[in-house]
A protein has these predicted regions:
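Sequence/fold signature of self-assembling virion shell proteins
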Residues: 2-14, 21-40, 64, 112, ...
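Assembly/oligomerization interface modules of large self-assembling protein complexes
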Residues: 31-99
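Generic hydrophobic, aliphatic-rich segments that mediate packing or membrane embedding
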Residues: 55, 76, 85-91, 97-104, ...
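Short, surface-exposed beta-edge/turn micro-motifs
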Residues: 56, 201-204, 278-279, 313
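Short, flexible loop/turn elements at secondary-structure junctions
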Residues: 63, 208-212, 320
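Structured, hydrophobic secondary-structure cores that serve as assembly/anchoring elements
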Residues: 90, 95-119, 183-219, 223-225
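Alpha-helical scaffold segments that mediate packing/assembly in large oligomeric complexes
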Residues: 108-193, 336-337
């Protein structure tokens, strides 16, 4: 110890040894660093139906009629040009098992905690349900985009299947600008393919993951005023992308997903999809349907309930009962990497 060093009494030590702040009080405040909210994009763009006292819902699939010349002396009996009312089908959407998210908070822990976290914990239960619905819709859209089975038999009704566009082998190693330009071109190809199948394109939307959204913003064409009639279609400054070939662009963290394994309570095998290579989903509201038997509902035990008395804890449960399925596969398309 140097001659001029002061011998300090360290008030935070225990018996003069160890950590110098061991006996100091730990202070906290009521601010909670909660999980960031994640927007659910897909849920906003599907056809929804609320049902009661049922397990499924049927959507009728009908086709086109044809015109032909009348043969003199031949009666019109309903089959001119091969027309047949029997060329129809049905799309059935079944309600899956009851989905829930729950949390039990021990009363003593809540009393000791300096922050009221119960409300935040219970809010996350509803968010968990919303996320699961959004991810399931994305998987069903991907299934529809990859469909190759025609729903009807007559040749005049062909083309009612999905569309998949595969990017080039060099896409993943290319620059941001190059990837943005290639993706924009692929979105245009999808729109043309849908037009050829008579799909109305006015209601199409495109959802991409955050990386691809940034690539479109970095590209040389999407936000370039020379390609947009002198009008703004997003800027580097704002980081926003407006439209590509007239299709509004959205971003979602639920687009790229690992392979999903079906559960016992999944009624639709189309949930089992692998979206690891998916880089865009283009679709309209007609592509997917969602049934709601029980809307999202939150329940919490009361202070004098049997659960609270027995476990000295508060239980919060969020539940919903839904079913999601393909409707018009021709209204769904995906863009994937090789």
């Amino acid at each position: 110890m140097a001659v001029n060093d002061a011998l300090l009494a360290r008030l935070g030590q225990i018996k003069g040894t160890g950590a110098v702040d061991a006996v100091f009080q730990k202070l906290g405040q009521s601010e909670i660093l909660n999980a960031m909210k994640r927007e659910c994009v897909f849920t906003k763009f599907v056809k929804t139906r609320n049902i009661k006292n049922g397990k499924s819902f049927d959507f009728q699939v009908t086709g086109r009629a044809t015109a032909a010349y009348v043969e003199p002396g031949v009666p019109l009996l309903g089959g001119l040009g091969g027309n047949s009312p029997g060329d129809n089908n049905v799309k059935n959407i079944a309600v899956d098992g009851l989905m829930a998210a729950d949390q039990a908070i021990y009363d003593l822990d809540q009393l000791m905690n300096y922050a009221d976290v119960a409300s935040e914990y219970f809010e996350q239960l509803g968010i968990a349900l919303a996320w699961e619905v959004d991810k399931r819709i994305a998987r069903i859209l991907f299934a529809g985009a990859n469909s190759t089975t025609e729903p009807l038999a007559r040749s005049v009704n062909t083309g009612r299947i999905g569309f998949k566009k595969t990017l080039t082998a060099g896409y993943t190693a290319a620059s941001k600008q190059a990837r943005g330009d290639e993706l924009a071109s692929a979105i245009g190809d999808v729109k043309v393919a849908m037009k050829k199948k008579d799909v109305p394109t006015s209601g199409l939307v495109c959802v991409v993951p955050p990386d691809e959204y940034d690539f479109l913003n970095e590209g040389t064409r999407v936000i370039n005023t020379d390609f947009n009639g002198g009008q703004s279609n997003g800027t580097i400054a704002s980081g926003a992308v407006g439209r590509v070939k007239g299709i509004p662009i959205y971003e979602s963290n639920h687009l790229i997903q690992p392979a999903y394994t079906l559960s016992t309570y999944d009624k639709n095998p189309d949930y089992a999809q692998d979206l690891t290579k998916c880089r865009a989903l283009i679709f309209s509201r007609e592509a997917v349907g969602m049934l709601t038997l029980r809307a999202p509902k939150f329940q919490m035990t009361t202070a004098d309930s049997t659960f609270n008395i027995q476990y000295q804890a508060t239980l919060g449960v969020a539940t919903q009962s839904i079913g999601i399925g393909r409707l018009r596969d021709e209204c769904a398309a995906c863009i994937v990497i090789p």
